[in-house]
Amino acid sequence: MKRMIPAALLALVLIAGGGWWLTTQLGGQTDIPAGALDAQESAEEVDTSSIVEMVQGDADAPITVVEYASYTCPHCANFHANQYKDLKAEYIDTGKVKFVFREVYFDRFGLWASMVARCGGQERFFGITDLIFKGQQTWVGSGQPGEVVGELRKIGRLAGLNDDQLESCLQDANKAQTLVAWYEENADADKITGTPSFVIDGEMHSNMSWADFKEILDEKLGDA
């Protein structure tokens, strides 16, 4: 199963707790300050070239797998707790697959998690991502923004980041806007409608068992 991206999802940037954050229009839970609306930019107006692709494996591997996932998606957490381990051991670590992880933002909590994961740079990104998915029920659980941020900071500190680093990353308004625009570009280009979704050598796949995933990879390796 995969989590569907709501059709009403729109990248709105708002001031909350001193930072600029992503929210959605669903249910109208959040009022958007006028200043934030004035500052909003469309994806076409934001230069996304500064966003680093998070990659594992051999850059010259015969197969490229791009995963689209949301940190608040239970199905994504399940994939990373199970099938991803097999994918990494059998295909990524053996040089058969170049794995690219791209974030999808259903809500502001997912954006905050992304900013914490990226705060550690390429070297720490996948380790922090693992911690975020493992602790998903804990940090998402309350649904209260202050508690969510507090739990994400705990994860960042567990990964070796200090409070100054975390504060700087979480308060980076330009980075938040750029990440949202980058996500929109990716989702539009690859026609992403839910998570987790996988683009395997340019072909979209979703709702797969590990056996199906493995069969696709082995077939492509046989053709390589």
Q: At which residue positions do the language-model features occur?
A:
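A short beta-strand-turn-helix
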Residues: 45-63
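Extracellular/periplasmic catalytic domains that process cell-envelope and extracellular macromolecules
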Residues: 59, 92-94, 124, 190-193
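Short extracytoplasmic/periplasmic juxtamembrane "stem" segments immediately C-terminal to an N-terminal membrane anchor
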Residues: 33-51
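C-terminal cap of thioredoxin/glutaredoxin-like
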Residues: 2-37, 70, 84, 154-224
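Conserved strand-loop elements at the edges of beta-sheets that form or border functional pockets
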Residues: 58, 67, 81, 207
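Residues at or immediately flanking beta-strands
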Residues: 6, 64, 96-98, 197
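Structural alpha/beta surface segment adjacent to cysteine/selenocysteine redox centers
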Residues: 69-72, 77-157
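Immediate post-signal-peptide N-terminus of mature secreted/exported proteins
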Residues: 62, 66-70
